[in-house]
From Swiss-Prot:
It comes from Drosophila simulans (Fruit fly). Keywords: Disulfide bond, Glycoprotein, Hydrolase, Immunity, Innate immunity, Metal-binding, Secreted, Signal, Zinc. Its EC number is 3.5.1.28. This is Peptidoglycan-recognition protein SB2. It comes from the Eukaryota. The gene is PGRP-SB2. N-acetylmuramyl-L-alanine amidase involved in innate immunity by degrading bacterial peptidoglycans (PGN). Probably plays a scavenger role by digesting biologically active PGN into biologically inactive fragments. Has no direct bacteriolytic activity. Its main location: secreted. GO terms for molecular function: N-acetylmuramoyl-L-alanine amidase activity; peptidoglycan binding; zinc ion binding.
Length: 182
């Protein structure tokens, strides 16, 4: 109980649906050279990582490091996503709020990118992942990082790609702020 209270007081709670700080999986701070976003943004772009899924903090942190390393090899400045959703129902901070991602060319300067860890071309994400994404969006609106009148789209709506997977895209189409075009 004391440890849990200490974590909550420090803002590091690991309860389901809460944001796990970047520092828990990546010791490297975000470069000050990465541009800031003009907030609130009006667009949320949903992705899937097409990696192995993860179902506990240790697995998810390993996958996050692999994704960041892959993005860096591809000459990104850092991990490309603002946030990632683990199969454990946790929200993992990538670049976080207010930092310009590298997840959807032509839209990076006006959006945040949320990636579901795994491949959702063949199946739907677990319900805890979907709920975590909804929670993150609520947090983003409450913190005035995302406009209350935001549009929600899948990555495939910004370029020719299968991302975020057909099952996840079909689910997103049921969400209230989903739009057919960015």
């Amino acid at each position: 109980m004391k440890l849990q209270l200490a974590l909550v007081l420090c803002g590091l709670t690991l309860a389901l649906g809460q944001i796990v700080p970047r520092s828990s999986w990546c010791p490297v701070p975000i470069s000050p050279r990465i541009p800031r976003l003009m907030v609130p943004v009006r667009l949320i772009i949903i992705h899937h990582t097409v990696t192995a899924p993860c179902f506990n903090p240790h697995q998810c942190q390993l996958v996050l490091r692999q994704i960041r390393a892959d993005h860096m090899r591809r000459k990104f400045r850092d991990i490309g996503y603002n946030f990632l959703i683990g199969g454990d129902g946790r929200i993992y901070e990538g670049l976080g709020f207010g930092i310009r991602g590298e997840h959807a060319p032509r839209y990076n300067s006006q959006s945040i990118g949320i990636a579901f860890i795994g491949n959702f071309q063949t199946g739907l994400p677990p319900s805890q992942m979907l709920q975590a994404a909804r929670t993150l969006i609520q947090i983003a609106v409450q913190r005035r990082q995302v406009s209350p009148n935001y549009s929600l789209v899948g990555h495939c709506q910004t370029k020719a790609t299968a991302c975020p997977g057909r099952h996840l895209l079909n689910e997103l189409k049921k969400w209230p702020r989903w739009q057919p075009k960015p």
